[in-house]
């Protein structure tokens, strides 16, 4: 069985290539330019946006963050990164338009997170400078680049329909989520429209007429080639989950081709929780002379996520344990990550046969059906979602209290003599819980010595603790997990105002 995500190819050669050949996937996606406007009369709620790093119900940015150091490397080597100009303690210090501040406050943002403290002054500075930004999952990266976008829009009658900002995401689910954040944060910005450019079942051939466009690289490329999307007025391009976008075969090629069609002076913003060393080199070429905000990889794991592992006797025993886990999975919402599409389908079939309510979503599910599944999960109609790495990154469903690594994530390395852990994907997977200071549980199933060794490698890489729980004592398993989830629901890590 083939794994869900292909291995990344040598990107340096692709970036240096003057005229990359057309990748079939760039034109095989039917395109749409769906445009949604935020009328003043009906403001979307924070829940509608599934916002990254804020929710009225959870206290927004009043949550405490763990201690970690944010390293700033300025493109101007003569500048002092400790200068107060490069760090703010309140959104009001940024000189934002009142309509943008009003949107922030409606989302319960009260003060910037650490990534926002450092990133926003650099993003909003003029003349615009490129940025490569890294921070822990669930700390408000999306909000940071959305604020920058909203602050740079010209919504005068002459420009209100001209695309001025482009956000590229690796999946339709993340693209739709980002659209929701922009709509909520910009709900008080008059005349704001957001266009979505993601694969659909039918090609509507609509012209893109919105100042903000969010989409997947292949679809955006298709729209530009068909002259349905005029990029000449674009001021900023954002790559969310940038390391994945640049390093993955196909996606990286498409991002490079899209950028080649944009204005040369465009502001390039790259954000992700992870930037492996080999990707940083390529990112520096994609976003030259960028200000950089980075963390040590030992500081990337989120403190609020309790990491556990269970010894399983075999792959079949994994399923037996998963069935036992169902009662714990539905206390909040849970995501189960597996290696292949076939595994996701088979586990869903067997759990449904056991009488359990679950849904699965993989890259093999098309367009509208994918939207229906993720919306059902967001709304709580289904509390357990089985998926592959297609949803490992960026997806923010605030009710998720548990992540299960049914299969330990591993790198696709055909010539390797042993299985190699994918530490970056592990971090992104478990980051679907513990969002913005909340508590979550990440449980990994281990059924072989190789899987155990991969988990040990992940533990060493991040310098983190992954506690073993005895599957022979189910009372202990339930007590450990329930205690953590109860502490999350009670808001034990909230900082009350």
Curated annotation (Swiss-Prot):
Catalytic activity, EC: 3.6.4.13
Motif extent (DEAD box): 240-243
Record domain Helicase C-terminal: where: 304-477
Annotated segments matching region Disordered: 1-62
Biased composition (Polar residues): 24-39
Residues of the Helicase ATP-binding domain: 122-293
Gene Ontology molecular function terms on file: ATP binding; ATP hydrolysis activity; RNA binding; RNA helicase activity
Record's catalysed reaction(s): ATP + H2O = ADP + phosphate + H(+)
Motif Q motif: positions: 89-117
Cellular localization per UniProt: Cytoplasm; Nucleus, Nuclear pore complex; Nucleus membrane
UniProt-listed Pfam families: DEAD, Helicase_C
Any one GO biological process: protein transport
Keyword Metal-binding applies: no
InterPro entries reported for this sequence: DEAD/DEAH_box_helicase_dom, Helicase_ATP-bd, Helicase_C-like, P-loop_NTPase, RNA-helicase_DEAD-box_CS, RNA_helicase_DEAD_Q_motif
Location (main, coarse): cytoplasm
GO cellular component: cytoplasm; nuclear membrane; nuclear pore
Keyword Transferase: no
UniProt membrane topology term: Peripheral membrane protein
Binding site for ATP: 135-142
Keywords from the UniProt entry: ATP-binding, Cytoplasm, Helicase, Hydrolase, Membrane, mRNA transport, Nuclear pore complex, Nucleotide-binding, Nucleus, Protein transport, RNA-binding, Translocation, Transport
Family that this chain belongs to: Belongs to the DEAD box helicase family. DDX19/DBP5 subfamily.
Subunit structure: Associates with the nuclear pore complex.
UniProt domain comment: The Q motif is unique to and characteristic of the DEAD box family of RNA helicases and controls ATP binding and hydrolysis.
PANTHER family: ATP-DEPENDENT RNA HELICASE DBP3
Function: ATP-dependent RNA helicase associated with the nuclear pore complex and essential for mRNA export from the nucleus. May participate in a terminal step of mRNA export through the removal of proteins that accompany mRNA through the nucleopore complex. May also be involved in early transcription.
Protein name listed in UniProt: ATP-dependent RNA helicase DBP5
Gene source species: Ajellomyces capsulatus (strain NAm1 / WU24)
């Amino acid at each position: 069985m083939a794994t869900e995500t292909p291995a990344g190819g040598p990107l340096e050669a692709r970036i240096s290539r003057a005229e990359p050949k057309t990748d079939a996937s760039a034109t095989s996606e039917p395109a749409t330019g769906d445009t949604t406007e935020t009328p003043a009369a009906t403001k979307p709620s924070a829940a509608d946006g599934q916002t990254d790093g804020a929710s009225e119900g959870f206290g927004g940015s009043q949550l405490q963050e763990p201690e970690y150091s944010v390293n700033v490397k300025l493109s101007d080597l003569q500048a002092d990164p400790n200068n107060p100009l490069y760090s703010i303690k309140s959104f009001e210090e940024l000189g934002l338009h009142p309509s943008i501040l009003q949107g922030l406050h409606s989302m319960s943002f009260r003060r910037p997170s650490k990534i926002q403290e450092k990133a926003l002054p650099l993003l909003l500075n003029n003349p615009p400078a490129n940025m490569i930004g890294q921070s822990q999952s669930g700390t408000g990266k999306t909000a940071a680049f959305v604020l920058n976008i909203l602050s740079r829009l010209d919504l005068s009658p002459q420009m209100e329909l001209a695309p001025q900002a482009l956000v590229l995401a690796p999946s339709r689910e993340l693209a739709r989520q980002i659209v929701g954040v922009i709509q909520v944060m910009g709900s008080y910005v008059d005349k704001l429209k957001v266009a979505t450019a993601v694969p659909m079942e039918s090609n509507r051939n609509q012209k893109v007429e919105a100042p903000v466009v969010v989409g997947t690289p292949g679809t955006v490329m298709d729209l530009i080639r068909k002259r349905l999307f005029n990029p000449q007025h674009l001021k900023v391009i954002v790559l969310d989950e940038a390391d994945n976008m640049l390093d993955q075969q196909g996606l990286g090629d498409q991002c490079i081709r899209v950028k080649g069609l944009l204005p040369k002076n465009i502001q390039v913003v790259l954000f992700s929780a992870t930037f492996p060393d080999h990707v940083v080199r390529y990112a520096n070429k994609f976003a030259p002379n960028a200000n950089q905000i980075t963390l040590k990889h030992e500081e990337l794991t989120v403190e609020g996520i309790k990491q556990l592992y269970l010894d399983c006797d075999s792959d079949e025993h994994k399923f037996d344990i998963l069935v036992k886990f169902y009662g714990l999975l539905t206390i909040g919402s849970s995501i189960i990550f597996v290696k292949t599409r076939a595994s996701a389908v088979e586990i869903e079939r067997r759990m449904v046969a056991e009488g359990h309510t679950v849904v699965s979503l993989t890259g093999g599910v098309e367009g509208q059906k994918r939207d229906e599944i993720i919306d059902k999960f967001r709304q709580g109609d289904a509390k357990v979602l089985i998926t592959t790495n297609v949803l490992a990154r960026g997806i923010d469903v605030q009710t998720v209290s548990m992540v299960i690594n049914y299969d330990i994530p591993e790198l696709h390395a055909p010539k390797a003599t042993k299985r190699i852990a994918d530490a970056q994907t592990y971090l992104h997977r478990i980051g679907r819980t513990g969002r913005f200071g909340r508590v979550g549980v990440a449980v990994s199933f281990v059924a072989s010595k190789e899987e155990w060794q991969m988990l040990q490698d992940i533990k060493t890489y991040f310098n983190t603790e992954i506690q073993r729980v005895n599957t022979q004592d189910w009372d202990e398993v339930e007590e450990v997990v329930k205690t953590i989830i109860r502490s999350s629901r009670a808001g034990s890590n909230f900082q009350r105002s």
